[in-house]
Amino acid sequence: MKPIHYFDRAAGTVVTESVMGDGALRFAYETLLGRTLWPVLFGSKILSALLGRYYDSPRSRSAIASLAAIPGCLADEAEKPIGAYESFNAFFTRRLKPGARPLGDGVVSPADGRLMLYLNADADAPFPLKGATRSLREVFGPQGTPPVPNGRYDIAVIRLAPVDYHRFHFPCACRTPDPVFSIPGRYQSVNPIALIRYPDVYADNERQILACEASFGRFWLVDVGAFGVGTIVQTFSGTDHAKGDEKGYFKFGGSTVILITAAGALRYDEDLVRYAADGLETRVRCGERIAVSVDGAPHL
């Protein structure tokens, strides 16, 4: 498989992604035996639960140093020294030092990750991500696709990797009048190796969907579970949220946050649009600006 590249906003350059668990993922998704076993093992909530139990235990502390050594982990931003974390999951779900993610103006990224844009899409249009193709109708599943003016959507897919900060936040001031809608599913990896070989991740993995109301209209946040992520934890309470308020976190594994708005409600930053048009993800940090609201845009 070719190396995975993305544009790193902070570094101002295209970089090659370091993939944690590369060998195991290649076995699972690129060999006949692995593809035969994945429905029993690699898509199993039981296996995810067992991994979660291990990574919650003190025995897993030795794995922290390996993760911290991967380029891009930025372990120095953690609120505590590495040695103070009692388990791998405690480090994986770490909070950051105050000021580590200053809030930009406009609408900000809800998570650290690699962002790809799919603009002016309809509910049935497949939106690819490193070989994966899924439509919004399939992602929303039994809940049904929410109606929007002209039936067109802008979609920002933010793919987290193990090196990333795994708490996610509200991208703007908003209200959440309805509870989170959960869709159970398997636990597939959202690593690019897995996405190329198994393109149904965003419709088959567990999803938790939250409808939000902001000054520019309604939008949706979809949290997607992945292989090794036994739990998506929602930490927010109440119905009124400030920009940057914590919404929740993922336990061990890479995963994804999808931000969905009516087409044209936001004007995404030019660099994100440009690199997306070239098929390249952009690495963004939680709290940095990704878009601004558009005056006169249709509200939901």
Model-identified regions with their sequence ranges:
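Contiguous, well-folded functional domains in the mature portion of proteins
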Residues: 1-300
